[in-house]
Amino acid sequence: MGVRVKRFDLVRVKDSEAYKDSDFVAVEEPLNIRTCFEKCEDFAIIMRTPGDDKELSLGFLYSEGVINSIHDVEDIKQVENNVIEVKLNKPIGIRIRELIVNSSCGVCGRAFLYTLNILKSDLKVKREVIFSFPEKLREKQSVFNISGGLHATALFNPQGELLFIYEDVGRHNAVDKVVGRLLLEDKIPASNYIMQVSGRLGYEIVSKGIKAGIPIICGISAPTSLAIEIAEEAGLTLIGFLRGKSLNIYTHSERIY
């Protein structure tokens, strides 16, 4: 696992007084994802927080449509600190990327929209269970609690148990790590789980969840208009402004009682 935080010297100003200090900062480094079928080729370079690179790579390739399940992958190995190779059992059939994916937007610069899955899930969750998610998320954000600089995504079951959590400088990377974990456990479509994110609910976050078959996505901030529109179309329950004992249900409220 790579280093996730580094300490840097700084000048801190408080109450108009300046003094020398130091602080921990979240690490951001490139990850070169190479896909291998007959020969290995560079597929994408992702700016990310080191660690959980296997989950990130698998989730990213799934979101890109390169793989449909873990059964499309013969092997995955970290050949260097910032290079990972994914051996496939079929050619990828799509053009190799020609851009660096930055940590704030995975689809910036591309005219790319997912073909939406229509979610089929009878999952219903109590409001009181949903209300517990943000605090449970914060308690488990180990790197954020040190540096204050990472996004987090967690997966919960209907009883409110936090199953796993991933952090990254990129909010969509954290989602890809969750999806990658689901792939590794062969749990896609994830029709009996709820995903909680630490930030806003944009199109990309929501579409990745839909593709993984997750029927309920919650965030502590606002959704975008496109996120609401695709959630409605796909049958996703989208919850925003989840804070304390309040929340907004934007689509398919029938799953929350």
Swiss-Prot record:
Residues the record marks as active site: C105
Record-linked SUPFAM superfamilies: Cytidine deaminase-like (SSF53927)
InterPro entries per record: Cytidine_deaminase-like, FdhD
Disulfide links within the chain: none
Keywords of this entry: Cytoplasm, Molybdenum cofactor biosynthesis
Keyword flag Cytoplasm: yes
Top-rank taxon, per record: Archaea
MF GO annotations: sulfur carrier activity; sulfurtransferase activity
Transmembrane segments: none
Localization per record: Cytoplasm
Primary location group: cytoplasm
GO cellular component labels: cytoplasm
One Pfam family recorded for the sequence: FdhD-NarQ
One GO biological process term: Mo-molybdopterin cofactor biosynthetic process
Function per UniProt: Required for formate dehydrogenase (FDH) activity. Acts as a sulfur carrier protein that transfers sulfur from IscS to the molybdenum cofactor prior to its insertion into FDH.
Family per record: Belongs to the FdhD family.
HAMAP family (UniProt xref): FdhD
Name of this protein: Sulfur carrier protein FdhD
Organism, scientific name: Saccharolobus solfataricus (strain ATCC 35092 / DSM 1617 / JCM 11322 / P2)
Gene this chain is encoded by: fdhD
